[in-house]
Amino acid sequence: MGAPLAAALGALHYLALFLQLGGATRPAGHAPWDNHVSGHALFTETPHDMTARTGEDVEMACSFRGSGSPSYSLEIQWWYLRSHRDWTDKQTWASNQLKASQQEDSGKDATKISVVKVVGSNISHKLRLSRVKPTDEGTYECRVIDFSDGGRGVPRVLCLLIPLPAPPRAPRPRGQPPGEEPGRGPTLLFLIILPGTGSGTPREAEPHQPHAGGCPARQS
């Protein structure tokens, strides 16, 4: 009875954290975000919440339709932010994240892990993360640069990865081969989406070593 109760309490703890983060990032009295960013621009595909066990492969999809006509260049950037602790600080998000400057507001703990650029009005890019592990914990961000507006606005979707601790190891049943061990605990991907503005310098980036998620978004 002790192990199942501990696992249930752990799951409730992370569910409470997810609800707290969702409440902190949505102003009171405001309707949920929609997919539209500005004009006809919108996200046509965003990452979904998902669960995965340690060692599994996961992927997060991000698709965007630009507002430019005729076609202009679009760019998708995937970023990895090593820490998610500031997510619980509502004032931090309101003052820092939603008022991004014209420069890349990457921060010292952010790493650009993937870049795709196309000439056209639609772009799509899936971030594939192999053999997820607890050290993959952090925030994954999909930024879109729409050059039809001069690259002034950068709509974004943010995905928070929270690995759950592994459950207590159960005794090996009689007759089970010594090499077999119980599986690791699940990894939860919670999705939180915020609007934002900013700009990025297009360039290729080396993939991030940790291998890592629909909610709507709009640009303020």
Swiss-Prot record:
Keyword Transferase: no
Record's signal peptide: 1-24
Compositionally biased residues, Pro residues: 165-180
Entry-linked Gene3D superfamilies: Immunoglobulins
GO CC annotations on file: cytoplasm; extracellular region
BP GO annotations: negative regulation of neuron apoptotic process
Annotated spans, Disordered: 165-220
Keywords on record: Disulfide bond, Immunoglobulin domain, Signal
SUPFAM superfamilies found in the cross-reference section: Immunoglobulin
Name of this chain's protein: V-set and transmembrane domain-containing protein 2-like protein
Protein species of origin: Mus musculus
The gene coding this protein: Vstm2l
